[in-house]
Swiss-Prot record:
CDD domains: lipocalin_heme-bd-THAP4-like (cd07828). Keywords: Heme, Iron, Isomerase, Metal-binding. Belongs to the nitrobindin family. This is Peroxynitrite isomerase. Forms a 10-stranded antiparallel beta-barrel structure able to accommodate a hydrophobic ligand in its interior. In fact, this fold hosts the heme group, which is located in a wide surface cleft. A motif (GXWXGXG) lies at residues 17-23. Its EC number is 5.99.-.-. Its cofactor is heme b. It comes from Mycobacterium leprae (strain TN). Binds 1 heme b group per subunit, that coordinates a highly solvent-exposed Fe(III) atom.
Length: 161
């Protein structure tokens, strides 16, 4: 664990670093798809972790999606995530986390979604992270374009060596 990591974040220290892997997406309004992904958690000696995420197409490496944000722990067991997406969406998610040995589980739901006028209508988002040693699995749920909240993305990433 980094010696300069804020004490509130120590339970989440295993997130720090780069994670790479593959994911799959689906939604009623689009064709199912697969993607390559890299997620990076880092810190700036402040009471939050920084988060960046980039995906690209498996077939040609073309960029697909990107987000960046901040994750903080307002009190033990509780977590907040502020994100900006490349697709004209900003979101605030709140939730809980638990740590059992090497296993960290995080569950988040949106409290606020901001959209620019030309963005697709996204009405709800939720995330579940499961970190077990050097494996980071997640799922994302989305409600958008008239569809209810439902499964959208699932991925398994591994710590980049």
């Amino acid at each position: 664990m980094p010696s300069d990591l804020c004490p509130d974040l120590q339970a989440l220290a295993p997130l720090l670093g780069s994670w790479v892997g593959r994911g799959m997406g689906k939604y009623p309004t689009i064709q199912p798809f697969e993607y390559l992904e890299e997620v990076v958690f880092s810190h700036l000696d402040r009471p939050f972790l920084t988060y960046t995420q980039k995906t690209r197409a498996i077939t040609d490496g073309k960029p697909l999606h990107a987000e960046t944000g901040y994750l903080r722990v307002p009190q033990p067991g509780h977590i907040e995530l502020v994100l900006a997406h490349h697709s004209d969406i900003a979101e605030i998610e709140v939730g809980t986390y638990s740590v059992t040995g090497d296993l960290i589980e995080v569950e988040l739901v949106t409290t606020t979604i901001g959209l620019v006028p030309t963005a697709k209508q996204v009405t709800a988002l939720g995330r579940f992270f499961r970190i077990d040693g050097d494996e980071f699995a997640y799922s994302v749920q989305m409600g958008a374009v008239g569809q209810p909240l439902q499964d959208h993305l699932v991925a398994v990433l591994h710590r980049k060596q």
